[in-house]
Amino acid sequence: MACSLRVAGSSARLGLPEVKLGLIPGGGGTQRLPRLVGRGRALDIMLTGREVDAEEALRIGLVDRLVPAGTAVDAARELARELCAASSPAQRAVVKTVDAAYDRPLAEGLRYEAEQVNELFERGEAMEGLRAFLDKRAPQFA
């Protein structure tokens, strides 16, 4: 749960069974799960200790991509290759902007977003991306 993108195989089963052991989910489970799936669903999973199958995990937002059983590692590697092809500063700005403004008023989030766009133009990342698009070539990000 402590990552930006989550890939699971179709046979995956996920859960936080700690209550069945007299514990609570540690390692941030009580904080991350509600943020991913909502308070009610998170409490259902944590209070019962039940497992969620892959289809339900995708439906409720616990995972972002569902792939055939046995291919999750390969799919995650392919996703990593896709991520490596993009601008790292732009990706950091996306995550930073989403995290900073997620529960803020829309106007505040839009202002913060505009600041991040301006910073990317100042760094040159955005200009290289636009030039590459116009030149019909792959961008060469630093």
Residues of each region from the PLM?
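C-terminal long alpha-helix characteristic of the crotonase
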Residues: V7-A12, A54, V63-R111, E115-G124, ...
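Conserved functional loop/turn residues at catalytic and ligand-binding sites
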Residues: S4, L23, R50, G61-L62, ...
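Hydrophobic alpha-helical segments typical of transmembrane helices
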Residues: G29-R32, R41, A90-A93, E113-Q116, ...
